[in-house]
Amino acid sequence: MKQFLDFLPLVVFFAFYKIYDIYAATAALIVATAIVLIYSWVRFRKVEKMALITFVLVVVFGGLTLFFHNDEFIKWKVTVIYALFAGALLVSQWVMKKPLIQRMLGKELTLPQSVWSKLNLAWAVFFILCGLANIYIAFWLPQNIWVNFKVFGLTALTLIFTLLSGIYIYRHMPQEDKS
């Protein structure tokens, strides 16, 4: 259910884009993201930090898109989010005692420190590459291609990378944890 909620604003954005235009889609994205945030608070009494950060960026970049009637702002939002994710992972890698990935998953999984570090770095690189791909597609290709890439391409890439990360984790888990 929670994963569905995370994708709901993206689905709403895509539907409004196909029916109306980028500006209606942006307004719908802001509203849908707010509704999901409110629902998460009411239902689970908790809002994830990343969901809150994403909401703030959606409101800021979406608001700028609507105010200036310029779709470049909403296109930049994707890259800014990925840059923040990558930055947080890299800072945790080099400044904190534990990589961020380990802080998020370390209670459920027992892995060697080197595996946590490689996984954390791999996700940082993934987010950097996705952000760069977004810049290229957003500003060098037609808007409809960017929307499709944002909705389907980045989602598919994230699911594939998550699957590959799961395989990598499984290969490095202690034998007793694999069952």
UniProtKB/Swiss-Prot annotation:
One of its GO terms (cellular component) is plasma membrane. Keywords: Cell inner membrane, Cell membrane, Membrane, Transmembrane, Transmembrane helix. It is found in: Cell inner membrane. Coiled coil: none annotated. InterPro entries: YciB. The keyword Cell membrane applies. The chain crosses the membrane at residues 22-42, 50-70, 76-96, 121-141, 149-169. It is a multi-pass membrane protein. Plays a role in cell envelope biogenesis, maintenance of cell envelope integrity and membrane homeostasis. HAMAP family: YciB. Belongs to the YciB family. This is Inner membrane-spanning protein YciB. The gene is yciB.
